[in-house]
């Protein structure tokens, strides 16, 4: 008795703790949605989860309990005789005493578990309720694509649930009948009462109908199969498995009926023959015959028989990853680029990205981190109108790193150090005389060296803001350091949940497991707690059904406020005949741009692709969550860009799926690949350039292709980002009858250049680390430039400095101190001003005599450096001598 009470107490305590945990999460989450203004999203999801969970739980509870009650009311004669049956017959009285009181609790526990599972099916339920027609039908079954996206998942769930409910009811019913004596085990076999047989017959008949429904759904699931060559239903599936599933759909309930009749009448042969026939047909029609058909008919004539199904796979994969909108344009390369062409494309030249993300991040960290507790997490690429010029820039937010605080305690981490401060912002191609980046915005407080102003530099919401903070307390917040002392601030934004009651303080003290929130005298009724500050967590909390890009980027709006833009994707694994990527996804769209204010955490979700069928359904599911892209402020819309990761994914699929002819696809005649330097494939890169046939420069994302297992260029893919052209993708294809150098071939030519190789060797011997930047392919007019920056660092922890720029064109490769000098050397024309650090910066009208003296001085200094063993200095003087001689030759 005491033991039973102890168990009961443990159960009650466990249930109470679970309930309190649920209520705690529920209440604090509700307050978060109140803060963000998306309570309708919270309630819609809550009602859907509750309704779905209760529906599944209620059906299972009613179904199992009904069968248990029917089994419990049946009366059977007592099998009291023979002792010989004692080894097999249960002790009925003891078993009844145990089983009878457990019936309802067992059904309730099962219903509770199924209810939790059912609550997770809320999205499928809402998908079905809000489904829309796509307008495109699958080529095999003739169903609208929307059926597979929105209806089939729920049908599969209901079928699986019905099967589980019937099997559970069958098991529990057999158990009760066995205990009550309706099913008696003896040495002579199993004796089943007529009432039991009739009950079990009905259950088995219903189960056969569920199995038939499963066979019917298997017909549609064939469109998600794979035969190794392509995805989707193939010849064998359509001509063997599909007819078999259709026959089984009809035979299964007939076999179930025969089984039920045989069981009802006690005719065991009739009961077993029909199900056995279904099993045999399934094995032959789904396993044996398709294998024979594939081996002896399809394999010898594969292309001829599979061509229509390969065409289906190509069309639907292109639909799934938005490849069908890519415009293919021939690009006939010539090598007649002139200085006049370079001058006409000055905006493109000035926006070639010389600063790589990794070296620039390290340089920013050493030059602009200011204090150890600030950190630059990432560098983002964007474009701005700077001093009237359309410019590509690199921007990095200066966030607060709690791990690097000099004194880590609750007051410092939660009340004082609450936010990061400002940004570092500069051009992608300009270099100071020391080989360092130039800045448009820098320092704390922000200093603007251009017409970009940051008026609200505080960053309360960012990529490193992983912990809660409490603002408007009695403790001043740290804003930024100065030479004369620290500057403090008080939060003036709308973010956070007001701590205006004891109940809220208790709730958040429990959620964050600290009594300090409850006991601290620094917290007043005017204070607010800000949580879910990590921008990725914040947007996922509101829209967990979207996949968010892991590379958010910050922009400065016209008012000088800092905003985060995060690309969001809709996705599905339910597009028939489409090749899936890792994780099973075979449909994906970049349909949403999420915006988060870095100061007050305000959220907005804008639909950037209204043609996406999934976002149309989500918009119906959650009215008020999404806004049209036309509602986005112009100062933010100017910074919307085509996402790097999405184009990378599309490019990976496009390497094969640019081939639309089934024969070419089958033979892989024109298979492409993304070129690689070393082991890592090239990634798409942003640049500003004038596309062929266009009249103005624009911000694009670019990635080259090479033929499979070859190094020459095959094409380049570009995604546009500006204005009405946003989202338009073009593939420029090169002639296949001549060689166009690819990145790997250019890289090899750079390595083979004697002067460049010698210079790299000299730097390495000196102990410097040479960092070779990304090799960029830049289309200019109908030609291609290849540009690679070189960085030097004293050691692996040293400050990277951009010391040289390598440019290749046609058969020429040059290395100069900056891009302008390299282009002038290749194409001539007006010489660009040289940096102040150049030791040879002289007036172009210097007399030959003076140039000769300068050349002799450089030569003598080079010899002196050689004798001293200073090979780096020797190389520098040779470079200086070369430049003087070139000036003399002009």
Swiss-Prot record:
Keyword Cell membrane: yes
A Pfam family per the record: UPF0182
InterPro entries, A to Z: UPF0182 (IPR005372)
Compartment list: Cell membrane
Record GO cellular component, one term: extracellular region
Membrane topology: Multi-pass membrane protein
Domain of life: Bacteria
Entry keywords, A to Z: Cell membrane, Membrane, Transmembrane, Transmembrane helix
Keyword Transmembrane helix belongs to the record: yes
Residue ranges crossing the lipid bilayer per the database entry: 6-26, 50-70, 102-122, 157-177, 200-220, 244-264, 266-286
Stated family: Belongs to the UPF0182 family.
UniProt-listed PANTHER family: UPF0182 PROTEIN SLL1060 (PTHR39344:SF1)
Protein name: UPF0182 protein Ppro_2689
Species whose genome carries this gene: Pelobacter propionicus (strain DSM 2379 / NBRC 103807 / OttBd1)
């Amino acid at each position: 008795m005491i033991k039973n009470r102890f168990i009961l107490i443990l159960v009650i305590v466990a249930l109470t703790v679970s309930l309190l945990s649920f209520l705690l999460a529920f209440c604090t989450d509700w307050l978060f949605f109140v803060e963000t203004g998306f309570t309708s999203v919270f309630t819609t999801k809550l009602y859907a989860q509750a309704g779905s969970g209760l529906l599944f739980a209620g059906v299972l509870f009613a179904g199992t309990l009904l069968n248990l009650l029917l089994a419990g009311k049946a009366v059977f004669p007592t099998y009291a005789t023979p002792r010989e049956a004692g080894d097999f017959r249960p002790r009925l009285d003891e078993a009844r005493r145990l089983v009878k009181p457990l019936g309802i609790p067992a059904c309730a526990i099962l219903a509770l578990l199924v209810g939790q599972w059912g609550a997770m099916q809320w999205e499928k339920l809402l998908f079905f309720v809000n489904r829309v027609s796509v307008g495109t039908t699958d080529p095999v079954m003739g169903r609208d694509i929307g059926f597979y996206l929105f209806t089939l998942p729920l049908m599969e769930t209901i079928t699986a649930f019905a099967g589980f409910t019937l099997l559970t009811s069958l098991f529990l019913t057999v158990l009760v009948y066995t205990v009550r004596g309706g099913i008696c085990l003896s040495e002579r076999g199993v004796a089943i009462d007529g009432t039991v047989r009739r009950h079990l017959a009905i259950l088995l008949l219903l189960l056969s109908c569920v199995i038939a429904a499963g066979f019917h759904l298997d017909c549609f699931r064939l469109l998600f199969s794979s035969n190794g060559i392509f995805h989707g239903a193939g010849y064998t599936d359509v001509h063997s498995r599909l007819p078999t599933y259709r026959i089984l759909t009809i035979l299964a309930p007939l076999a179930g009926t025969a089984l039920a009749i045989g069981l009802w009448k006690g005719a065991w042969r009739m009961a077993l023959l029909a199900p056995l026939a279904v099993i045999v047909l399934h094995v032959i029609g789904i396993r044996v015959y398709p294998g024979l058909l594939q081996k002896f008919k399809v394999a010898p004539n594969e292309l001829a028989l599979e061509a229509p199904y390969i065409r289906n796979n190509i069309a639907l994969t292109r639909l799934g990853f938005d490849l069908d909108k890519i415009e293919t344009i021939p690009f006939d390369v010539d090598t007649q680029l002139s200085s006049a062409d370079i001058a006409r494309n000055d905006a493109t030249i000035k926006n070639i990205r010389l600063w790589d993300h990794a070296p620039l991040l390290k340089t920013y960290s050493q030059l602009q981190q200011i204090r150890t507790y600030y950190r630059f997490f990432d560098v983002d690429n964007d474009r701005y109108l700077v001093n009237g010029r359309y410019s590509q820039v690199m921007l990095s937010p200066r966030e607060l790193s709690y791990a690097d605080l000099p004194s880590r305690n609750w007051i410092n981490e939660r009340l004082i150090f609450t936010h990061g401060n400002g940004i570092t912002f500069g051009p992608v191609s300009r270099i100071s005389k020391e080989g360092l980046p130039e800045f448009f915005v820098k320092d704390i407080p922000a200093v603007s060296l251009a017409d970009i102003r940051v008026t609200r530099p505080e960053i309360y919401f960012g990529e490193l803001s992983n912990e809660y903070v409490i603002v408007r307390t009695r403790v001043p917040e740290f804003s930024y350091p100065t030479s004369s002392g620290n500057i403090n601030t008080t939060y003036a934004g709308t973010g956070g949940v007001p701590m205006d009651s004891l109940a809220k303080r208790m709730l958040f003290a429990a959620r964050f497991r600290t009594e300090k929130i409850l006991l601290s005298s620094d917290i007043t009724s005017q204070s607010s707690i800000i949580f879910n500050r990590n921008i990725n967590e914040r947007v996922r909390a509101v829209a967990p059904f979207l996949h968010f890009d892991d590379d958010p980027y910050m922009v400065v709006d016209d008012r000088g406020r800092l905003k985060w833009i995060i690309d969001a994707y809709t996705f599905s694994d339910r597009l028939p005949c489409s090749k899936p990527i890792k994780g099973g996804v075979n449909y994906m769209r970049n349909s949403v741009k999420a915006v988060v204010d870095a100061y007050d955490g305000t959220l907005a979700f804008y639909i950037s692709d209204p043609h996406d069928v999934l976002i149309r359904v989500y918009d119906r599911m959650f009215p008020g969550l999404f806004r049209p892209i036309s509602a986005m402020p112009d100062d933010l819309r100017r910074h919307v860009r085509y996402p790097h990761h999405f184009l990378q994914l599309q490019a990976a699929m496009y390497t094969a799926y640019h081939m639309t002819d089934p024969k070419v696809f089958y033979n892989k005649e024109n298979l492409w690949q993304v070129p690689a330097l070393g082991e890592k494939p090239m990634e798409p890169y942003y640049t500003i350039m004038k596309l062929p046939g266009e009249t103005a420069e624009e911000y694009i994302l670019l990635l080259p292709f090479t033929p499979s297992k070859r190094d020459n260029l095959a094409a380049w893919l570009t995604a546009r980002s500006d204005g009405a052209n946003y989202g338009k993708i073009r593939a420029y294809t090169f002639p296949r009858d001549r060689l166009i150098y690819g990145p790997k071939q250019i890289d090899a030519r750079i390595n083979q250049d004697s002067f460049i190789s010698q210079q790299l060797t000299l730097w390495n011997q000196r102990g410097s680390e040479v960092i070779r930047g990304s090799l960029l392919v830049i289309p200019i007019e109908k030609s291609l430039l290849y540009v690679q920056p070189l960085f030097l660092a004293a050691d692996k922890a040293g400050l990277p400095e951009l010391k040289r720029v390598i440019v290749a064109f046609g058969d020429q490769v040059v290395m100069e101190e900056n891009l302008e000098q390299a282009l002038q050397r290749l194409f001539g024309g007006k010489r660009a001003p040289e940096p102040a650090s150049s030791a040879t910066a002289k007036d172009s009208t210097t007399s030959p005599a003076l140039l000769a003296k300068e050349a002799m001085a450089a030569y003598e200094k080079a010899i002196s450096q050689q004798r001293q063993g200073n090979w780096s200095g020797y190389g520098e003087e040779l470079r200086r001598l070369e430049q003087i001689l070139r000036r003399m030759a002009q």
